[in-house]
Amino acid sequence: MPRDLTHVIFAEDIRKNLSAEAQRDTGENTAAFHMGAIAHDAFLYGSQPKLATKLHGGLGDDTRAVMIEMMDDVRAEKDPEKQAMKKSFVYGFMSHAAVDTTFHPFVYSVSGSQVPENNPDQKHVDLAKTRHRYIETWLDVHFLREKGLSLDTFKPFKQVANDKRTNAVVPSFFCENYEKAYGIDQDLTPVFKNSMKIQLFIGRVTQNQPLGKALRALDNALDGRLGLAVSGFYQADRAMPPVLKDFESYKHPVTGRNVVQSLRGLTRDAVALGTVYIAAAEKYIKDGVTKAFLKAVPNCNLDTGVENTKLADIKLATPADVEKLKGEKIKAFMRKGFKAFPCGARNADPARRKQADNAPEFPLIPFKRTGFPYAPPPTGLRRVQPACERAGYRPCPRFSAKRPAFRHLCARAVSE
């Protein structure tokens, strides 16, 4: 799985390439479309995660079986409103398959296999899962930034969680056809609903920046023992690791061959493949010709990207160092000047505060002995204290008796 936000972003990009009818159906049933885009992964968060592994073909199952059952259900549906809703879910489901098939070989080439038999012990399994979460969370951050979206404002899953019309029809539609496709004698609808609730809840929690920073600090203090918990948190204040952004090729984790491909190329290919998949689904719903659909949508394992393989076949990956996947903090304040404002402006009336906000900017001068960024006052000694208070990091150097470096700085300001 690339994570949920990546799947929704790609679903929207793929939507632009669809037929007018498909665009209308998905536009009128956005909640169903987005639910379909993340449905493959929902079971991973619940009590039966192997149901998700099965959907991805990880156990050797045909990844198209559920698709065909759902499309036959859509063909038999007589209610136009429900049919459009179900079609939208299927189209989102197809987009997920296309994105996973395209991106997962690269993801696993960096994260390594999570299957116990491919690892010497549980510690290595957990490391692979940690790397996997880091990679997919970074992909979310990358595509959000590329689209100019923010975690604070981009909330596609509110509608998924709150749309009563969709939740009354789609979960049972999906689960009943899942049961038919794989011959499961169990009502999976409550399992799916509970799993998706957890999925959406974790998605919200991992967007909490203060909590993420606190956990990262604790993880560093504990030598990485919180890796699994920390790796899923979004890092809005950090830059995406070069190993995930600037690559030009990667070693396929199953075949071992060198795949010449970049992040931009993977993005382009995922959108193109999703367009083909949904066009094939739309055609099948209209004419019911199975052979044409199976030719357009091969039985690719969604983890390996290779036909007729299992998750355990990932044996040739070259995992990256976890430390290289954490990203470096963006030191934006070192590239921008501070705004100087009068002493006490933080507690002043609105007029003075506005005046302070409109004050001119001054460049930062890192002080050699302390490395502390200091904005020199525009005039003599009287502006030293306000400028220091304005910086907000340490007390004014004039009153830092135990800081000779700052006393020296103060003296220099006096002489100037």
Residue ranges and their predicted role:
Residues 411-415:
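Short, intrinsically disordered C-terminal tails of secreted or membrane-associated proteins
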Residues 362, 367, 372-374, 393, ...:
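Aromatic (phenylalanine/tyrosine) cluster motif
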Residues 1-92, 97-367:
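N-terminal leader/auxiliary helical segments
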